[in-house]
Amino acid sequence: MRAMNRYENMRFWILVLMTSVSGFTQGMLLPLISIIFEKDGIDASLNGLNATGLYIGVLFASPLMEAPLRKFGYKPLILTGGLTVFASLLLFPAWKSLWFWFVLRLFIGIGDHMLNFSAQTWITSFSRKGQLGRNIALYGLFFSLGFAVGPYMTRLVNVDERLPFIACSIISLCFWLAVFLLKNEHPEADLENVSFLATFQRFGKVWKLAWVALLPPLGYGFMESSLNSSFPVYALRNGINVDAVSMIIPAFSIGSIVFQLPLGMLSDRLGRRKVLIAVLLIGCACFAGAAFSKSNAIALFACFFVAGMAVGSTFSLGISYLSDLLPRPLLPAGNIMCGILYSFGSMAGPYLCGVIIKYTNGAVFFLLICMILFVLSVLIFRFKKTTAPVPRHS
């Protein structure tokens, strides 16, 4: 029994650490490439459009994930996804091209989604009653921790543009090797056919039962990608230097790290819906404040930090809420849909905010994020749960 508990703890922490590397990769790539392209004089809207490559990769891979997961299990998908990310990172220094880097980001999106979807579904499948919120909060916390550290790699661009990509690929490889210590497992089987068409049929069931739980990942994707991809462009155009940008962007993730676990545990006690409504409204107020901070780096740091404390947990809270609303056999499809909605938000964010920065004074993009968070809070408030809570194993 003691050996089993030791293995279960090791399994959980390896999955969580792999997630932190995924966050680290995304947290580095978004501001790093935005800064490189901005210095090269590339148009802000094209810069934002290039950032969507990662999320197009997620969207492309999403409908194809469930069948191989059920057939091969969690471990092979995590290993394949990690290897794809590692190889793509190594190729960035090979050729500096707008469209080549777009393709590499697309492959990183596919690899990251394979890794995150498998780890996320694995964690929700073995989490015991009363620990789901805590476990998913730790999952989100370590993703945020990686995401917070990632932007600091932008400083290496002053030494050599290739250095951040090489360093990130080596770090990814080291953590990827730890996955070989895990025993492969498969999702809980159901009686339905595992096929491309059956996956879309399960998507329909997930949407019918738990559409409201898919809104937080959508909003989080829009907000996160906008802050990491569009904010550096806004900052550089308003006299904020690269060093300040590399401090302001992680403030959001640091705030998220501080409150991720407490909010997850609080949601276990009070319910996901109440906690989600509260944090979305607080985040709305923070970004309204950021819109009036203009080029004040200290004020922006404070707004990002407090916003991170609140809405930095919306993705993990959305996953926990989804797990509350769905029967266990629908969890893989539900987690895929979280990734799809997150990707839609992440694709829309950099492009729309890039256009706004191009044609306005830039700060309007904070108000757009503010409006989206407010609308999501209203929709969640109006949701009336019609299904009984899904029982989890004790």
Regions found by a protein language model. Give the residues of each.
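Juxtamembrane intracellular "pre-TM" segments in multi-pass secondary transporters
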Residues: 1-9, 184-213
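Cytoplasmic helix-loop-helix junction between adjacent transmembrane helices
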Residues: 106-142
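A late C-terminal transmembrane helix in Major Facilitator Superfamily
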Residues: 329-359
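Helix-breaking motifs and short loop linkers at transmembrane-helix boundaries and internal kinks
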Residues: 73, 94-96, 271, 293-295
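C-terminal membrane-cytosol helix-exit motif in multi-pass small-molecule transporters
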Residues: 169-191, 376-384
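Helix-to-loop junctions at the C-terminal end of transmembrane segments
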Residues: 61-73, 260-271, 357
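Structural signature of the two symmetry-related core transmembrane helices
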Residues: 76-90, 274-288
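Helix-loop boundary and gating motifs at the non-cytosolic
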Residues: 6-55, 221-234, 238
